[in-house]
Structures are given as C-alpha cells and as structure tokens.
Amino acid sequence: FLKEDVADPCQPVRFREDNGWLVRFYYYRERISVEVFHALSDGGGAIVFFRTLLAEYLRQTGVDVPAGNGVLDLNEPPREEELEDAYARYAGSRTLRGKLEKTAFPNTSAPEPFYTLNVTLGLVPVDRLREVAKSYQATITEYLTAVLLQCLLENQAARRFRHPQPVALAIPINLRPWFPSETLRNFILTMR
C-alpha cells in the first residue's frame, strides 16, 4: 500500500496483496507517486484523488487547502456524477469494432526481464513545447505523438526491412471533452 519507490513501476496488481487495495503509493526523498488500477479510474480521476489526498495531508500538517480546483471536499458525500459509469450512459450496450488493421512494426530491442519497464524522465518548458506544437498547427499531444511515430519510422528505416510495415501507437483519449461527464471513474478510449 505504501512502499519505498521501486525501479520497475506498473507491476501487476495482485488482488490478494495489500488487503485488496487497488492503489499503491510510493515515496522517494521528497517525491511521492501513486499507481491506480485501471478499473478504478483513469488519469483524470486518479489525479483528483491524489490532489485530494495531498490536500488532506497538508491540512493535517497545519496548511489550509480549500476544496475546489481538483480537490474534493471530504466533508461532503460523493456526488452521483463522480461515481457515474459514463461508458454505460453514452455507449450503452453498443460496441464498435474497427476494421482489422495490418500488423504494425514491432519496435523491439534487447529483451528485458518480464514486467520490466524503463522510466525516462525529461523536463521541457511547457510554453516552448506548446509554441513548437503550435508551429505545426498541432496540440502538444498531437505533436508528441507525431514525434514518437517519426522515431518509430527512423528505427524501422535503420533496420532496413525489406518490406516496411505501418507504425502505430496506442494513445489514450480522455472522452470528457466530447461527452460531458464529471465521473472520476475510467472514461478513456484508446486509439490506434
């Protein structure tokens, strides 16, 4: 439940560990982080939970942090909108099946042990990043997606495949801007 930070984040959630909690908290020096099982919430809901938790921690140390701006009021019961299954409201029982897509380029490198993830940390001034993205008439997400796709194309070209394959990324899309919802539950769609 509360652990010292680990080298390999996003390990499988084992329901019998940590008394059934589907949330993990990590600390390292003055940094804390949280992992939330995807069935509980997406990044949008998880950040509200994390902000609220941090606000309560600060309150208990004597710092006044008001509710609002992504911090829930712990003296109020959860609102129905926060608990809503927005998928059920907007999609109902309908499912959409995409066309079968061609197999994408396998961007593989030296094998890692099972469930090993490598974390790369970079700091970029967001104003400068927004400016560069805007110069391509793109959002930051669109621009970074294009940069990643370009890297995949260059990686494939360097390997000199006889028959190049399409490159693909799985991008999580927050559905709240298109389907109004205040749910704190998972409400994303992964696009390829």
Region roles according to the model:
Residues 63-72, 159-167:
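Short, glycine/acidic-rich hinge or "gate" loops at secondary-structure transitions
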Residues 1-24, 121, 153-192:
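Acyl-thioester-dependent acyl-group transfer interface
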Residues 22, 33-35, 54-61, 107-119, ...:
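Short, contiguous, well-ordered secondary-structure segments
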Residues 1, 68-124, 171:
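Short amphipathic alpha-helices and their capping loops
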Residues 28-33, 126, 189-190:
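Glycine-rich, often proline-containing surface loops adjacent to acidic residues and nearby aromatics
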Residues 35-51, 119-161:
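Acyl activation and transfer enzymes in specialized metabolism, enriched
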Residues 1-7, 37-41, 109-123, 132-135, ...:
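Acyl-group handling in specialized metabolite and lipid biosynthesis
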Residues 1-51, 55-59:
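Acyl-thioester-dependent condensation/acyltransferase catalytic cores
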